[in-house]
Amino acid sequence: PTPEIFETPHYSATREAYYGIGEQYPVRYERELLYAGTLTSTQAGPHDYYGQFFPYAVNDPYGTHVLPENLGNFEPNEINQHPPRLAQEVVDAAKLNLVNTHATASFFFHPYYPLPELKKIVAGIKAEGYTFVTASELK
């Protein structure tokens, strides 16, 4: 099969890389970095950006359709100066996301963490009324 959706490592790329990725892949799955000056064509420094994630799929200024990862990830331990994030916190984020009509709820789960934690998240998100679908169905 030919890949149709791209995910940048750690949801991070330069402005130029986002444009290049868009030439090969019409769809990305991720949170994304938006760089200062992207909409105005003005120059900005390499660290003049902010992370952006949406409650639903969007077309971004780099010319790509972006499927959001907007609930974060399960992380039982403090890492990279980020506090632990437990299964219930991912579910709570999905519940808060329901303030939006037709919201998409998407999260990341590392495969080396215990499967029962993933099952808690899935059950909790389903209990909030979400339906799980493949990423290609969101296009």
Tell what function each PLM region has:
Residues Y25-P46, N97-K139:
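C-terminal domain-boundary segment and adjacent tail
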Residues P3, F53, A127-G129:
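Generic intrinsically disordered, low-complexity segments enriched for polar/acidic and small residues
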Residues P1, G20, K120-G124:
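Amphipathic alpha-helical segments that form well-ordered structural scaffolds
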Residues E4-T8, S106-F109:
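Short catalytic-loop micro-motif centered on adjacent basic/acidic residues
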Residues E7-L98:
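Active-site-adjacent pocket scaffolds in enzyme catalytic domains
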Residues P1-T2, N100:
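A structural motif corresponding to the C-terminal end of an alpha-helix
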